[in-house]
Swiss-Prot record:
Gene name for this UniProt entry: CYTC-2
PTM annotation: Binds 1 heme c group covalently per subunit.
Listed name of the protein: Cytochrome c-2
A biological-process GO annotation: gibberellic acid homeostasis
Family, per entry: Belongs to the cytochrome c family.
Residues at which heme c binds: C23, C26, H27, M89
SUPFAM superfamilies: Cytochrome c
Location in the cell: Mitochondrion intermembrane space
Protein function: Electron carrier protein. The oxidized form of the cytochrome c heme group can accept an electron from the heme group of the cytochrome c1 subunit of cytochrome reductase. Cytochrome c then transfers this electron to the cytochrome oxidase complex, the final protein carrier in the mitochondrial electron-transport chain.
Modified residue annotations for N-acetylalanine: A2
Organism: Arabidopsis thaliana (Mouse-ear cress)
Length: 112
């Protein structure tokens, strides 16, 4: 598995397309929007896992105490259930390093 340090540069436009097709069914990035099946991702970077107000997280997600940054998201998005065993997230992950880098680039812009 390539580490985030070896990840290709991300393209936010490509990442937005990935978000719309693979993430938007369960998540939003819109400030002030309610939660969907998954939590609102606005303000994601620098936040600890399991701490978004108003969302009911799994015990595993709360106790893992991951600080969401580019590196942790890169690893998490490869295989969420392996990274946080017991997570409620059903998404199987993004296997391609470029897809993960693109999605993270979009999230950096879209959740700020």
């Amino acid at each position: 598995m390539a580490s985030f340090d070896e990840a290709p540069p991300g393209n936010p436009k490509a990442g937005e397309k990935i978000f719309r097709t693979k993430c938007a069914q369960c998540h939003t990035v819109e400030k002030g929007a309610g939660h969907k099946q998954g939590p609102n991702l606005n303000g994601l970077f620098g936040r600890q896992s399991g701490t978004t107000p108003g969302y009911s997280y799994s015990a595993a997600n709360k106790s893992m105490a991951v600080n969401w940054e580019e590196k942790t998201l890169y690893d998490y998005l490869l295989n969420p259930k392996k990274y946080i065993p017991g997570t409620k997230m059903v998404f199987p992950g993004l296997k391609k390093p470029q897809d993960r880098a693109d999605l993270i680039a979009y999230l950096k812009e879209g959740t700020a």
